[in-house]
Amino acid sequence: VFKEENVLGQKFVVSAEMLVSRSENDDLATSVNYGEVSLFIDNIVRNKVFKLIETLAENIAEGILKNFNVHEVTVKVEKPWAPVGLPLDSASVEIHRKWNKSYISFGSNMGEKSEYISNAIESIKANENIRVNKVSDIIVTKPYGGVEQDDFLNGCMEIETLYFPEQLLHFLQSLEQEAKRVRKVHWGPRTLDLDIVLFEDEIINTEELTV
């Protein structure tokens, strides 16, 4: 990116392909106003400065998903006459983002169990990158693993999130840290336990996450 481009501005061509819920009726109130989406994109492009077209595309996709009744979006940002030193008409980037369905289990068997769980649920609901669809009843379960400890309070929630799996994991771990969780004994007691049970239909096996 040349300095002059940030000062004088650049030309972009933006397209957005959106997946919306099936229309059960002809009610405009439940549809997506494509004119409003176009103006929303135009406002981002005109009034914000980005050094990378990748960042611009991310901001557009995230904004559409958060502000309109859209489940998935593919955003393409094209920069005509990009100064890349080659005879190209343009340079472009295309990204696909969506609300990912996931199931999170929660539990506690130390201290104020109900309060730890309640605070975690409220923090998850307050995160703009997460929508909480359903929260189960909380049940009492016996501890597993042979370590003598108090009974657990357990439950599960269905969410939709803009996070990738590892990003969701890191957010949940930050809530565990806020609850002063200490990882010393395997299968040991804990103030707060938040686990990703399912993430879409993905099978994940990395150094830090197994789903």
Model segments located where?
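N-terminal, polar/charged subdomain of small-to-medium soluble alpha/beta proteins
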Residues: V1-S102
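Short, solvent-exposed loop/turn elements at beta->coil junctions and helix N-caps
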Residues: F2, E78-A82, I138-G145, V185-H186
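Residue-level signal for inorganic ion chemistry
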Residues: A16, I60, N109, V135, ...
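Short beta-strand-to-loop capping motifs
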Residues: M18-V20, S108, E158-Y163, L198-D201
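Short, surface-exposed acidic-centric catalytic microdomains
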Residues: S23-G35, N119, S123-F164
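Flexible, gly/pro- and Lys/Arg-enriched active-site loops
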Residues: E24-D26, K101, Y144-D151, E166-V211
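A short coil-to-beta-strand element that immediately follows conserved catalytic motifs
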Residues: E72-V75, R131-S136, P189
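Extended accessory regions or peripheral subdomains of proteins
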Residues: S102-I121, N129-I130
